[in-house]
Amino acid sequence: MNKKILQILEYDKVKEQFMNALTTAQGQQELKDLKPLTDKEKIQLLFDEVADFRLLTQENGLLNLGKTNDLTEILRRLELEASLSGKEFVEIKKVIQLGINIQRFFDEAENVETPSLAITLEKLVDLSALVKKLEIFDNAGSLYDNASLELMHIRASIKSHQSEIRKIMQEMLTKNLSSLSENVITIRNDRQVLPVKAENKNKIAGVVHDMSASGQTLYIEPNAVVSLNNKLNQKRIEERQEITRIYRELASQLKPYSFDIRQNAWLIGHIDFVRAKYLYLAANKATLPELTTDKDITLFAARHPLIEAKIVVTNDIKFDAGLNTIVITGPNTGGKTITLKTVGLLTILAQSGLPILAADGSRIHLFDDIFADIGDEQSIEQSLSTFSSHMTNIVHILAQADENSLVLFDELGAGTDPKEGAALAIAILENLRERNVKTMASTHYPELKAYGVETQRVINASMEFNIDKMQPTYHLQLGVPGRSNALEISRRLGLPETIISVASQQISDSEHDVNQMIEKLEEKTREVIESSRNIKKIERENQSLHKDLTKVYNQINREREFELEKAQKEAQEVVKKASLEAQEILKNLNDKAALKPHEIIAARKELEGLAPTIDFSKNKVLKKAKAQRGLKQGAEVNVTSYGQRGKLIRLEKDGRWTVQMGSITTRLNEDEFEVIESPEQIQAKTKNVSKKVTSKVKAQLDLRGMRYEEAELELDNYIDQALLANLIQITIVHGIGTGVIREMVQKKLQKHRHIKSYEYAPINAGGSGATIAILK
């Protein structure tokens, strides 16, 4: 795309609006290098990245990025094996750490997928191992003492020497106060010295390192610390040598990763730029327009990004595929130029992958180039008039524009005789129309109104003017040609009516009719626009509501999945625990060579007890699901409110069912009846269990005539058989006799854990000679 259009439309000024949101040098450089694209897939990917980031932020909060500087020169020197400073190592560390933080943020993000951003993230190289090597620096770029064992020893020695020197110097300071010009210990040539009065220089033996400007003070290093200072300086030399060695070793370890570090820096910069686009999008209520290749430009609530938000006027601009040319007529200062610039600028921004100031649903066609003749480009050096300057530019545009270009003309044909100017304007527009070039032109020539009405694929437009307030509203009116309001404005400003009447007589009847027609058309257009705005407001509210509902729905689904997963895990734990206990029970059973029937029953009860009892009767979800499976035409139901059976006839629109109960037909809600399963359904759910029955168990046992031991064994076996046969009540006839057998029966029943209760039989059924027992 030509550079001139970027200058005319002030493209770089709009780019500057993104700069404050960028925190990395690489992100700022990507913004500076940004140019409009023509590849739809590349632009769409840029939009998709912003959409991904918006979704990510909504679900997980805003990604925080730290400030980083440009590593280009640092990495170049690293590759040349030149020495780096501690601060430069810290700059490398910042970039590496930031890459790790970004990767961690995306890895830990929940409830969102970012396929477009994943393309960039997949290229990030894991350099976490290098961070550990760079942790030897503090934020200022100084090495920590533990950067190496040698450095630790050297610095410990330095501190020891400094402490010893400080102690001696403090003693000498106190002892020689009268000989000093100041009561301080100072530094000269990296050595601690005392400020001695010149006349007292012989009182303190030592080395003179400096003299004050007046010559009144000598800075003397006492002989008592010369040796210690020499040792201290030697240790400092060793410290510098060790630091240099550490730097060199670290640089050699980083050099093989210089390409990865550089790539990560640019990838981080790209993420930073995507983040800045999102922040611009959110702060300005901007949109990511739909990209088209069918020459359709549809902008809803379009705003010029360089006009302050408080005063900017939004416009709906529909320059669809069926139109070639829009001719905006009417007086100056109405906003025609801003409208042209808005269309061109928003198109360029969209083709740069940037959000545009418009409402959702906007569409932008991708142009190969955009040309404009806007503003006064008169050249004094070339001695060109205003008209000549414009015409030179127009000649260039006509030579370069093709069917995939957008052309913008401001005041086409101005600067010359009105009739000739209008004729030229029509001829230029017709040339572009015949070549199928998308064109928008503003003009104040009335002749172009007729051209807009009479010519196919050309439409008139105008900027609305409020007569009552005598000022433009800056609203674009498509389909309505502009009209002059000179007479009405003059009347309101106080021009005598006689003059206005004479002026009005100079205007032909046809022109009066046209102006009246335009006035009515403007009124109708305003009504349509107002109605359209109300509809769009409702649409936006519906979209917002739909968005909120979708978010709530997704949240409910996520919570449901979480609860299901949680329940599944709990169920697995229950099953696992029950399985282990069952295995233990079975093991105990296997350990016994033979089991009595009552022991088998006890084991079975124990196994049954492992299964958790769950009450689903109050589970509304299951009840609803069950009801939905059974609710169909012809299904048999039990009508709970009537206590009768019925049949479902049909489902009504209000959600109720028509139910036939004999000769009665009524409408019922689903909670007023229950589905009755058919015999086939019951049979399908029933599992056949074969039982081997050796003999039919009677409900009565007669122990009369048996010995004690025989009766006791017989009673045990009988109770076991009764339990296996699922008997509820048994009768044990023991007779009265001596009472020994009766007492044995009573004790057995009392201790048996499967006996719920027992009592003597009624008088007519044996009285105290028989005992009736109820089984659990």
Curated annotation (Swiss-Prot):
Similarity section: Belongs to the DNA mismatch repair MutS family. MutS2 subfamily.
Molecular functions (GO terms): ATP binding; ATP hydrolysis activity; ATP-dependent DNA damage sensor activity; endonuclease activity; mismatched DNA binding; ribosomal large subunit binding; rRNA binding
Protein role: Endonuclease that is involved in the suppression of homologous recombination and thus may have a key role in the control of bacterial genetic diversity.
PANTHER family, per database record: OS10G0509000 PROTEIN, OS10G0509000 PROTEIN-RELATED
Keywords of this entry: ATP-binding, DNA-binding, Endonuclease, Hydrolase, Nuclease, Nucleotide-binding, RNA-binding, rRNA-binding
Nuclease is among the record's keywords: yes
Positions of the Smr domain: 701-776
Origin: domain of life: Bacteria
Chain sites annotated for binding ATP: 330-337
NCBIfam families to which the protein is assigned, alphabetical: mutS2
GO BP field: mismatch repair; negative regulation of DNA recombination; rescue of stalled ribosome
Protein name, per record: Endonuclease MutS2
